[in-house]
């Protein structure tokens, strides 16, 4: 009985269809394992690993570089230390408000990563403004440190009337971040307007920027203002940070909305191809019998097609360059505004007075028909998983650039140098 069963099994395994399934099964296991290793950072992948995805990798290196950079410029003596400041005619004004945090403080790493590795031409084109947004700025651990005066173009606390200052103190005491956050954002925008810079970059004090962020951003802005791809006066901001949590398969995607059709097409195409091969190459008929074709079309092709969907949309179709992001954009970690759009935006924020700043900007863009853009891949990471606004950690974890940590430092450095050396980029740095 056992011998008969074994012979039947061996006979079955000797069939072409069984051999195809065995080989395909082995290939599928290899592909599945590769996907587990390669796509575990995509939050909408079947291989997402939430246990390890928030560990710093590239951000940790940049934090060390940033802190080393600021520590060099924090020496007690001025001897041997050159101030690294911008000019009075910047191409970009970068501004951030910083407050004392109860736990982790990333302000120094934010400023350091913003400035370290900048070419002198890049630094001269950038005006950096820092607002200490505690009504008592001496509470902040970085207030008064020497590196600020040597690296930052404008360091300030509130320069407002007594009445406004008392109101800010009340907001601070009441933890009214919805109103004070909007006030600070408007304050920064107005500060940058005074510099005359054509672009205004507002970022938060708990981010880490990648090597080469400035030249890549200016290159993207050049595309938006020159040539056949110009979008003058039609966009409100260029986003340097976005999170992949918003970039999932949705009903807007044709092949996701029509997934049954996708499976039928690949299965039908595979079947047609195999039948065509069997018809024109008689030598294949013994192998390509009906059972083999059925195994390929009904098992193998659907399995590998399903694996593609399981990878996640962003893993399969990563963004590159300047792209529209009108729907899935999130948060205000790093937005670059064209100067001409800022006065009207300031007026709207002052009118609304309080709320979630990012939602208010999105609402304004919807009402005015202005396009929201993003520079891909992300140029900064939001490392402040503990919010300064009493937000839940589970909410701040969703504000994470998952693939940012896969950046290769050597590759980014080489790319930065290549972009600086390219003759067609001299326009933005001379």
Regions found by a protein language model. Name each.
Residues 2-57, 258-262, 266, 270-430:
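C-terminal catalytic/acceptor-binding lobe
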Residues 89-98, 114, 126-130:
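Hydrophobic targeting segments
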Residues 96-109:
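Active-site beta-to-alpha loop of glycosyltransferases that engages the nucleotide-sugar donor
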Residues 110-125:
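Short, acidic, metal-binding catalytic loop of nucleotide-sugar glycosyltransferases
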Residues 133-199:
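Active-site-proximal specificity loops/subdomain of glycosyltransferases
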Residues 196-208:
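Short beta-strand-to-loop acidic/aromatic patch adjacent to the donor-nucleotide binding site
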Residues 211-242, 246:
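Conserved donor-nucleotide/metal-binding helix-loop-beta segment in metal-dependent transferases, i.e.
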Residues 232-270:
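Cytosolic-side membrane-insertion boundary helix
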């Amino acid at each position: 009985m056992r011998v008969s069963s074994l012979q039947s099994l061996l006979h079955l395994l000797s069939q072409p269809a069984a051999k195809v399934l065995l080989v395909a099964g082995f290939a599928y296991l290899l592909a599945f394992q590769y996907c587990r290793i390669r796509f575990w950072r995509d939050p909408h992948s079947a291989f997402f690993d939430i246990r390890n995805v928030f560990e710093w990798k590239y951000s940790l290196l940049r934090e060390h570089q940033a802190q080393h950079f600021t520590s060099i410029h924090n020496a007690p003596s001025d001897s041997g230390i050159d101030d690294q400041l911008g000019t009075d005619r910047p191409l970009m004004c970068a501004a951030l408000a910083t407050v004392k945090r109860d736990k982790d403080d990333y302000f120094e790493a934010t400023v350091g990563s913003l400035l370290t590795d900048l070419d002198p031409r890049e630094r001269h084109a950038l005006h950096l403004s820092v607002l200490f947004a505690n009504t008592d700025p001496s509470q902040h651990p970085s207030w008064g440190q020497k590196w600020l005066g040597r690296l930052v173009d404008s360091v300030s606390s509130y320069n407002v009337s007594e009445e406004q200052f008392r109101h800010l103190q009340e907001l601070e005491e009441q933890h009214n971040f919805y109103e004070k956050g909007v006030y600070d954002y408007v304050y920064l925008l107005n500060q940058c307007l005074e510099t005359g810079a054509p672009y205004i970059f507002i970022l938060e004090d708990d981010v880490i920027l990648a090597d080469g962020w400035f030249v890549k951003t200016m290159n993207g802005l050049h595309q938006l203002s020159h040539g056949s791809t110009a979008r003058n006066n039609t966009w409100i901001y260029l986003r340097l940070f976005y999170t992949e949590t918003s970039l999932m398969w949705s009903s807007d995607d044709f092949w996701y909305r029509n997934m049954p059709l996708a499976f039928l097409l690949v299965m039908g195409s595979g079947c047609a191809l195999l039948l065509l091969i069997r018809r024109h190459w008689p030598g294949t008929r013994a192998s390509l019998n009906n059972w083999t074709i059925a195994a390929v079309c009904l098992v193998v092709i659907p399995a590998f097609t399903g694996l593609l969907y399981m990878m996640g949309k962003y893993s399969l179709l990563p963004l590159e360059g300047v792209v529209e992001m009108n729907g899935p954009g999130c948060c205000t970690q790093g937005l670059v505004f064209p100067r001409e759009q800022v006065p009207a935006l300031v007026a709207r924020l002052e009118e609304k007075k309080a709320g979630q700043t990012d939602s208010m900007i999105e609402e304004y863009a919807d009402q005015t028909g202005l396009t929201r853009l993003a520079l891909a891949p992300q140029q900064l990471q939001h490392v402040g998983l503990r919010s300064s606004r009493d937000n839940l950690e589970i909410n701040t974890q969703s504000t994470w650039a998952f693939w940012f940590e896969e950046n290769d430092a050597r590759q980014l450095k080489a790319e930065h140098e290549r972009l600086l050396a390219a003759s067609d980029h001299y326009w933005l740095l001379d």
